[in-house]
Amino acid sequence: MLNTSDEDVVLVQRCLAGDSSAFEPLVERYQRPLYNLATRLLGSRDEALDSTQNAFVKAFENLASFDQGQKFFSWIYQILRNECFNVLRGRRPSAPLPVDLTASGTPADAFEADQRRALVQAALLDLTEDQREVVLLRHFTELSYDEIAASTGVPVKTVKSRLYSARQRLAVLLAEINLV
């Protein structure tokens, strides 16, 4: 039985051989995780949906450039990342990052959760784009260091360094507002 990575390569090969329907399983497999990443990077569901769709279109149009030794997810994530950064560059002040800190119970609990969410979003926005990206990929998408490195195109050591710096900065910021 083929693993996901091998299945992806077979599907890409079929697409390159003219079977465009072979791209559909790739979309089905990766649409949700890519959309979730775009939503976290952009803070806007509409922009995330547009960016995700654009990433799939560009991936399909450029399948011939896919290195079959690389994971398809890492490759298409790079395309999505570029799409998201283009959106961010074209924006005025950044929309808040969605952070799921939902509370259950009373309206007071919901209000408190909203306040915490806003404070954490502000802290995340205080990070550099590189730091915020690795935090989102590691803690919200739960990618491994190797997967983050492949997705962002930087060495694993750089990923770890950015993550360490981001965690240190977040600890300071969250301590200042009494969230840790």
What are these regions (language model features)?
Residues 61-68, 78-97, 113, 165:
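Arg/Lys-rich amphipathic alpha helix in sigma70-family domain 2
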Residues 58, 74, 81, 85, ...:
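DNA-recognition helix of helix-turn-helix
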Residues 36, 50-57, 70-82:
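Structural recognition of an alpha-helix C-terminal capping motif at a helix-to-coil junction
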Residues 1-4, 16-25, 35-54, 156, ...:
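Short, charged helix-capping/linker segments at alpha-helix termini
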Residues 2-4, 14, 113-114, 119-126, ...:
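C-terminal edge and immediately downstream basic/flexible tail or linker adjoining helix-turn-helix-like DNA-binding
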Residues 1-5, 86, 93-117, 122, ...:
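Internal acidic/polar
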Residues 16-17, 43-44, 54-71, 90-93:
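Sigma70-family region 2
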Residues 134-138:
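A short pre-motif secondary-structure segment
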